Regions:
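Alpha-helical interface subdomain recognition
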Residues: 1-84, 107-112, 119, 123, ...
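N-terminal glycine-rich flavin-associated loop
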Residues: 88-111, 137
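A short, Trp-centered hydrophobic/proline-enriched beta-strand micro-motif
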Residues: 123-131
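Short Gly/Pro-enriched turn/cap motifs at secondary-structure boundaries
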Residues: 135-138, 162-165, 178-180, 206-213
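Flexible, small-/acidic-enriched active-site or ligand-binding loops
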Residues: 142, 194-225
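A structural signal for short hydrophobic beta-strand segments in well-ordered beta-sheet cores
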Residues: 145-148
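A short core secondary-structure module
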Residues: 157-200
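A short, charged helix-loop
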Residues: 215-242
Length: 384
């Protein structure tokens, strides 16, 4: 098993992508409570993310990237999760990497890659992918937004909901229906924000990840050149599968880093906080919660590491992806609640940031496919 990052003190950004965010901790963690309360995207902190080089990790050098592997990208995001207490900002960074850049590099034309990837890699062009619809949340294969061929263009009509980064995005990757019902009637298009017919709604107020904006996006007679299609017509399911595997691996590597930091903080508190003349960590009830947190962290690490290796080497990882997403998201919520309990009244206060962890964690059991959908998928793949 890969040792916990805390046991690798000599790691540097040059030797381990995990360390990319660490030099910027002070700037990333400034006034986190205030940004969360205002539910605003922290633009100055985004510039810090840009300077860190984290956004460049998985992209080819000819587009300004670092030519890192899938594992490198997971490590970079794990390190960001450990370093940055603004989980919403981290989530937007993960979305920036996977939403448009990853599928564009894998499936896009050279013309589109040369034109758009450099800005994506630097973070100057913020990206979002539009999959979820108001009437089709977890049922992504029944997308109803349509794209109709009209000469050299497609005309897109419909709408999407809960689109991360949409209020600030410059580029959108749209998953739409160009053919018959089912997975093989889907296609994917790259669309710029200022294209006539594309409307971005107001940011939606939400429980957690409050600095990561999301909104509705609607399309009315949105005319997109056929040259902006990513991959072949009807290849949308293939692209979606490629993206969703990486979305889960990347965003929950971020979560793993958050869990590592939470464990370290809880352990420090349990050793220093005294009640009845003893550190509270000596009480079995507290000690067992912390032991369970350590088990949860290492279980999450094992699932992410093994599943990432399968995806990176092209092995079938359908069950592994669903299990990883379920295990890590639910462990994150459980350990966040345990941290509140260990901190007691202090954990209930916004100033400590512990309650914010709970609000941020809950979303992980919903986005990228709910825990219930993941269990359904596992059962189906087992032949049930």
């Amino acid at each position: 098993m890969t040792p916990a990052p805390s046991t690798l003190p000599t790691a540097t950004p040059e030797t381990d992508p995990y360390a990319l965010a660490a030099p910027w901790a002070g700037e990333l963690n400034h006034d986190v409570e205030q940004w969360d309360a205002r539910a605003e995207f922290p633009w100055e902190k985004w510039k810090v993310i840009q300077r860190s080089g984290l956004l460049a990790v998985p992209f080819e050098t000819r587009y300004g990237g670092s030519a890192g592997t899938l594992t490198d990208t997971m490590r970079a995001l794990e390190g960001l999760g450990h370093t940055c207490r603004d989980t919403g900002l981290g989530f937007s960074a993960s979305t920036q990497i996977v939403s448009v850049g990853v599928p564009l590099q894998a499936f896009g034309s050279e013309e589109l890659k040369s034109r758009f990837l450099p800005g994506i890699v630097t973070g100057d062009s913020i990206t979002a992918h539009a999959i979820t619809e108001p009437d089709n949340g977890s049922d992504a294969l029944n997308i109803s937004t349509t794209a109709t061929r009209d000469g050299d263009d497609y005309v897109i009509d419909g709408g999407k909901m809960f689109i991360t980064n949409a209020p600030i995005a410059d580029l959108f990757l749209l998953y739409v229906r160009t053919g018959k019902p089912g997975p093989f009637g889907l296609s994917v298009f790259l669309v710029e924000r200022d294209t006539p017919g594309l409307r971005v709604g107001d940011p939606l107020d939400k429980m957690g990840l409050r600095t990561s904006p999301l909104s509705e996006v609607t399309f009315t007679g949105l005319r997109v050149p056929a040259a902006h299609r990513i991959g072949q017509e009807g290849a949308g399911f293939l692209i979606l599968d490629h993206v969703m595997k990486r979305e889960i691996l990347f965003s929950f590597s971020l979560t793993l880093g958050e869990m590592e930091h939470r464990l370290r903080r809880v352990l420090q508190y349990a050793k220093s906080r005294r009640q009845f003349g003893e550190p509270i960590g000596t009480f079995q009830g507290v000690a067992h919660k912390i032991a369970d947190m350590k088990i949860a962290v290492e279980t999450a690490r094992k699932w992410l590491t093994d599943t990432g290796a399968k995806v990176e080497t092209g092995q079938d990882a359908a069950i592994d992806i669903a299990a990883t997403k379920t295990v890590v998201s639910e462990a994150n919520t459980r350990t966040a609640l345990d941290a509140v309990q260990i901190f007691g009244g202090q954990g209930y206060l916004t100033a400590t940031g512990i309650e914010r962890d709970v609000r941020n964690a809950v979303g992980g059991t919903i986005y990228s496919g709910t825990s219930e959908i993941q269990r359904n998928r596992i059962a189906s793949l087992l032949g049930l």
